[in-house]
Amino acid sequence: MTQHTALVVGARGVIGGNLIAHLETLGWDVIGLSRRGGTDRGAVRHIAVDLLDRDATMQALRGLTEVTHVFYAAYQDRPSWAELVAPNLAMLTNVVDAVEPVATHLEHISLMQGYKVYGAHLGPFATPAKESDLPHMPPEFNVDQQQFLERRRDGASWSWSALRPSVVAGIGLGNPMNLAMVIAVYASMSKELGIPLRFPGRPSAYTSLIEMTDADLLAKATVWAATTEDARDQAFNITNGDLFRWSSMWPKIAAFFDLEVAPPLEMQLAEVMADKELLWNAMVDRHGLVATPYRDVSSWTFGDFVFSWDYDVIADTSKSRRAGFHEYVDTEAMFLGIFQELREQRLIP
C-alpha cells in the first residue's frame, strides 16, 4: 500500500485542525502549513510560512517531494468582497507553484470553498443550491480559485475536488469563522451577567431555515473526495444533512447553559461585545479557564454576518450521496457536544 502524505494548508484553523486529526486516524503522514506553525507530534510536522510571501513559500516548500495530496483550507480576511480575491488567489497559486514541480507523486489537490459560490453572502439566493447552479456576478474568490485549479489540471496527472460546506462548527480559537465559539462565549457571558439568552440577529433570521457542517464530518468528506475515483475534478456540497431554525435551536442552546430565553433583540455583536474584555478576564480568573486573550475567543463580526441571514440558507447534498458519501450528523447534538468539549477543555465555564 502506498503511503499517503498530506499537505494541509491552513492547519491552525477549525477545518484544517480537524482534518489533520482525521488523517492521523487513517495513518497518513501529515505536514501542516500555517503562518504561526505548530508543535510536531508523531506523523504530523508543521511548517510556518506567510503564503503571501511568494519567495518564502517557494523556499519553505521546495523540499516537499513526498506530498501526494494537498488539502487547501487557508483564508485571508479582507474588508470587502473585492479585496478578498487577490490575496486568497495568490496564496493558492504560491502553494501550487511551489509543490507541483517537486511532488512528483502528487495525486490530488482539494479546495475548501463555501456558499459564497452561490451568492449566499449577497442576499437571498436560489435554494436548495446545487453544484451546477450558474455563477453570480463577481468578485468571488472561491470561483477564481477553482478556475485556477481547473486550468492547472489540464494535462496534469493529479485531480482536484472542491468542498462546499455550510457554516462550519468545531473546536478552535483565533478563527475568523467559528460560529460555535461565538454562541458559546455569548451565552457564557449572558449567564455571567445574569441575563437571559436573546437571539441577537434579525427577527426574520430567527425563523429562516439554515443548516450547518460539523468539522469532523467535513474532514471525512474531504478525504473521501480526495481518494474516490468518482469524485475527481468536481465540487460537492457537504452539510450535516438536517435543517433547523434558530427559533427551535435557541431554547436548546439556552438549556445547555442553564439560561432562560427572551425574545430576539437585534444588535451588532461587534459593537455590543467590544467592551467585554474585562468581563472575560474576570471569568477566566473566577472559573479557572485557560488564559485565552479576548481577541482570540470569538469572532463577533462573523456572528453578526450569520445572524443577519433573513433568508433560507440551504444546499442540495444529493450529489455527494449519489457518489458514495453518506455520513450524517445531528446538528443539535453537534452544538451540545462542542459546548461540552469547550467546557472540558476549560475554554468556557
Per-range role (PLM):
Residues 219-303, 316-318, 322, 339, ...:
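Mid/C-terminal beta-alpha module of Rossmann-like enzyme folds, strongest
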Residues 134-166, 171:
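Active-site Tyr-X1-5-Lys
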Residues 156, 168-186, 216, 224-236, ...:
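Glycine/proline-rich active-site loop of Rossmann-fold NAD(P)-dependent oxidoreductases
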Residues 4-26:
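N-terminal Rossmann NAD(P)H-binding glycine-rich loop of SDR-like oxidoreductase domains
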Residues 38-94:
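NAD(P)H-binding glycine-rich loop region in Rossmannoid oxidoreductase-like domains
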Residues 185-213:
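A conserved pocket-lining segment of Rossmann-fold NAD(P)-dependent short-chain dehydrogenase/reductase
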